[in-house]
Amino acid sequence: MLKVELLKKQIFGEVAACVYVIEFQKWGFQHAHLLLILKSGSKLLNPELYDRIVCAEIPNPEKNRHLCSLVIKHMIHGPCGDKNKQSPCMRGGRCKNNYPKNFSPYTGHGEDSYACYRKRDDGQKIRVRKHELDNQWVIPYNPYLLALFDCHINLEIWSTFMRV
């Protein structure tokens, strides 16, 4: 069904190529990595376009309670670091995924090939496993896909081919 959304409905634009691999995690659940290469006319060339597709913030629960609950359920990293030094993502006293991320008032290009998503310091906090967390802990997601599939779907935009 995800392939239908991406390849047939082309929710992110016309697709030139799609490559994916399905892995099985330690506990037997399927886990997919999928790379979409968009055609020239559909490429996301600036941070304003990134923000139309990817979000890395907690939705306002008064405006969209359902989406907020899905983000809390599926798209919060950890907690790790000082909040949980025993988290599986910890390597040498640091999170291997670099959480918590820095606050940022806008989306921009990162030093590597990933975008740095808007994570505003808006004072909004949520409670997850006895910890108060904010936008620094939100994994990038697409609101439409998160609501449609009700599961963890980490969505990242690469601005170069350095990682491929």
Which residues fall in each region the model found?
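Extended, structured polyanion-binding interfaces
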Residues: 1-164
